[in-house]
């Protein structure tokens, strides 16, 4: 998402920026609260326009079959709990993008759980134990410290 922050408040400036690809336009002065609210809205919108659904995703030795809700590592089916699968599937559908803790918690557990980062960390640890050859050095899900997680695709995938 692109949010333009500008001192220019003329309509033609706003129209030019929005027509040029900006998702929002905010004119100075503005409060930090308004800016963060607009960032949250832009992020929600960007996640709603998720990439087209593909029936399967394969990277390295990991295969996720979204239609069958199955996960395989090196051809072996891995049993995930329903919540673990939802976390993995959401991250995989947004591969390469940083998904914040709050976004992931709201999507999987609901808005009331947006601050339950400990719950998310516990589930992420369980997912890594099941998927990763070396859970301490993950290949598939990278922690973006203080922000969230990113699902990684191997080069050429």
Describe these PLM feature segments.
Residues 31-44, 79-89, 101, 114-134, ...:
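DNA-recognition element of transcription regulators
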Residues 41-98, 102:
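Short, Lys/Arg-enriched segments at the junction into DNA-binding effector domains
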């Amino acid at each position: 998402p692109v949010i333009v922050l500008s001192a220019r408040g003329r309509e033609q400036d706003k129209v030019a920026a929005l027509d040029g690809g900006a998702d929002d336009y905010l004119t100075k002065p503005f409060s930090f609260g308004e800016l963060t609210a607009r960032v949250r809205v832009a992020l929600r919108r960007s996640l709603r326009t998720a990439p087209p659904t593909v029936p399967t995703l394969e990277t390295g030795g990991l295969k996720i079959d979204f239609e069958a809700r199955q996960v395989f590592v090196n051809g072996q089916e891995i049993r995930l709990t329903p919540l673990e699968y939802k976390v993995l599937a959401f991250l995989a559908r947004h591969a390469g993008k940083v998904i914040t803790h709050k976004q992931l918690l709201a999507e999987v557990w609901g808005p009331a759980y947006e601050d339950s980062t400990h719950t998310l960390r516990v589930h992420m640890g369980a997912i890594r134990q099941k998927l990763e050859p070396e859970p301490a050095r993950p290949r598939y899900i990278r922690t973006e410290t203080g922000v969230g997680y990113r699902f990684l695709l191997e080069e050429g995938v």
